């Protein structure tokens, strides 16, 4: 897929954060030397080509009272896709991948309560033939910020605003109070926002309020960690990032905090967590690593383990995207 230098710069800028202003495309255009209309036309073209999955709000479910967890299980090939269809049918499941490992199905599930969670997991277990289902809740979040560097600058990492991870962690502990108008605005932005010259005015019309109400409430939701950002979300493979590796490692408890922060600093890492371990699955440090080739993922892992007291480790490459969508109410 042919992208010029301005396309790539625009994709990087729009992944970072779309300004919460009446004229967001003008603000972006001034930074890149483009007219607002050209920003919008290029954005529409990149979405039509499939490089951009969607443009809208990236929300933190925990800030609205949902608990997200990672799950893995070994599913026999004869029932793999039947089980995947059941998993994917639940709204609370946003990601589901086949990975190159004995545990070949990995999915995420957000639910408001343990009762709701079990009502979903029961049918999933049954469809998969009742294998052991590993549950990996996060115990510490070091990074949660997908940024695919489209400009090929090795020094350019994810432009995460200062304090943003702290706000997300706070929202995990103290869910934000929201009213019905907040929820209407969230619903309008959890899919695709309107690609218009004044997009937030259209969001306001649909939500039944004024544009300034929308912008003010989005700023508040962002400051409390419920809204991570309004941004463009890319399709990894179409953007050239075909290698997607889940790195898991065994780290001493007294070292995992510092090691996790150092691992999170790699620009290729989008997610980095401390997660629950088990006697037969001792890994407690997890990171998602994205790159154009598996060799680069392996290079990042080598660089990390040469500097850290890592015990056992593994890299589970994804071989098939079974479901990938944004969380929604």
Question: What feature does the model see in each segment?
Answer:
Residues 1-329:
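A compositional/biophysical signature of low hydrophobicity enriched in polar/charged and small residues
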């Amino acid at each position: 897929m042919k992208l010029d230098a301005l396309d790539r710069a625009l994709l990087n800028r729009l992944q970072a954060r779309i300004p919460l202003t009446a004229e967001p495309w003008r603000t972006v255009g001034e930074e890149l030397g483009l007219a607002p209309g050209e920003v919008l036309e290029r954005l529409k073209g990149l979405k039509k080509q499939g490089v951009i999955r969607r443009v809208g709000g990236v929300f933190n479910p925990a800030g609205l009272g949902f608990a997200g967890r990672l799950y893995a299980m070994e599913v026999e090939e004869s029932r793999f896709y039947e089980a995947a269809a059941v998993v994917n049918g639940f709204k609370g499941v946003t990601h589901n991948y086949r990975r190159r490992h004995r545990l070949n199905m990995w999915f995420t599930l957000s639910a408001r309560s343990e009762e709701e969670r079990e009502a979903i997991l029961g049918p999933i277990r049954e469809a998969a033939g009742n294998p052991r289902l590993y549950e990996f809740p996060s115990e510490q979040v070091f990074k949660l910020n997908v940024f695919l560097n489209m400009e090929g600058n090795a020094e350019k990492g994810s432009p995460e605003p200062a304090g943003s991870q702290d706000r997300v962690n706070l929202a995990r502990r103290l869910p934000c109070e929201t009213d019905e108008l907040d929820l209407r605005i969230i619903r309008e932005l959890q899919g695709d926002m309107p690609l218009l010259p004044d997009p937030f005015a259209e969001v306001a019309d649909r939500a039944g309020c004024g544009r300034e109400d929308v912008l003010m409430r989005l700023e508040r939701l962002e400051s409390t960690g419920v809204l991570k950002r309004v941004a463009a979300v890319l399709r990894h493979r179409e953007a050239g990032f075909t290698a997607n590796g889940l790195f898991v490692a065994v780290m001493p408890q007294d070292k995992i905090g510092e090691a996790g922060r150092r691992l999170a600093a790699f620009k290729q890492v989008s997610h980095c967590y401390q997660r629950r371990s088990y006697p037969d699955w001792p890994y407690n440090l997890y990171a998602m690593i994205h790159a154009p080739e598996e060799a680069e993922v392996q290079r990042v892992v080598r660089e990390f383990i040469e500097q850290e007291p890592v015990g056992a480790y593994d890299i589970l490459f994804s071989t098939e995207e079974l479901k990938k969508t944004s969380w929604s109410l």
